[in-house]
Design a protein with these regions (language model features):
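C-terminal helical subdomain
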Residues: 170, 191-227
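Conserved glycine-rich cofactor-binding loop
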Residues: 12-13
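Substrate-binding pocket helix/loop in short-chain dehydrogenase/reductase
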Residues: 90-91, 95-101
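Residue(s) in the substrate-gating loop at a strand-loop-helix junction
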Residues: 132
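Conserved NAD(P)H cofactor-binding loop of Rossmann-fold oxidoreductase domains
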Residues: 82-87
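Active-site helix of classical SDR
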Residues: 114, 148
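Rossmann-fold cofactor-recognition segment
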Residues: 47-62
């Protein structure tokens, strides 16, 4: 990976930040798309001797994405989409802006950004999308989040078929110990419930870097959760009826 150039979203917080730091450790040149340039400057001011470029872009603003411009001779060996959000509340409790924001950031913005970046991607570029185990299950009080991630997962699989020259890797994760939960559930009740099984962002970032190097198609963490959800998909209504608490743990 040394000397390659990756463009990353969501790189100033949580898992995205851990991924960026692992990329820099591997001598990768990084371009960050961020909404808050000052925040990025503060976070990475100590990264002396490492190549990192920051470009302002609001992923909730389609015009901001479409207006992105790069030098003609620039190319990207990898594109990591780590931006995302969710609100852990019932369908009826979501307001219009929360619904639109969820699908826009988790799904639509990736499509628009990929279209903008496509001319700058190398012929065998790595496309890494951070999805969720929520894509594989029905969850009360996380319907829009789960639906957006299910759509994203389907999209990544289709992209793999349509562009076999690209390395498409989807990362499906359970709860991670990151600031994501502060916005998803300000009460932090869900985070406290899941405290013992929270994934470590730094270890997950290590796994993602290894997955890029070895061209894995999927990373599923924690593995036990993914295996359990595979069983759930065989008879989903049966599991929902017999184990209702498992599907209402965000309430």
């Amino acid at each position: 990976m040394k000397g390659q150039h990756f463009i990353v979203t969501g790189g100033t917080s949580g898992l995205g930040l851990s991924i960026v730091r692992k990329l820099l450790e591997n001598k990768v040149n990084v371009t960050l798309l961020v909404r808050d340039v000052d925040k990025a400057a503060r976070i990475f001011e100590q990264e002396s001797g490492k190549t990192i470029n920051v470009i302002p872009c609001d992923l909730n603003d389609m015009k901001s994405i479409q207006a992105l411009q790069f030098e003609e001779n620039i190319s990207f060996d990898g594109f990591i989409y780590s931006a995302g959000l969710g609100y852990f509340k019932s369908i009826s409790d979501h307001n219009f802006s929360e619904m639109i924001e969820t699908y826009q950031l988790n799904l639509i913005s990736f499509n628009v950004l990929y279209t903008v970046l496509r001319p700058y991607l190398t012929s065998n570029a790595h496309i890494v999308g951070i999805s969720s185990q929520a894509a594989f299950s029905t969850q009360a009080n996380a319907a829009h989040y789960g639906a957006s991630k299910a759509g994203f997962y389907a999209l990544m699989n289709a992209l793999r078929l349509e562009s076999p020259n690209l390395h498409i890797m989807t990362v499906n994760v359970g709860p991670i110990d990151t600031p994501f939960h502060q916005k998803a559930d300000p009460s932090m009740k869900y985070a406290k419930k899941m405290g013992k099984i929270m994934l470590d962002a730094n270890q997950l970032a290590e796994d993602i870097i290894y997955g890029i190097k070895t061209k894995q198609l999927e990373i599923n963490r924690p593995k036990w959760m993914h295996h359990g959800l595979k069983m759930y998909q065989i008879a989903p209504r049966f599991f929902e009826r017999c184990f209702p608490k498992l599907f209402k743990n965000k309430a």
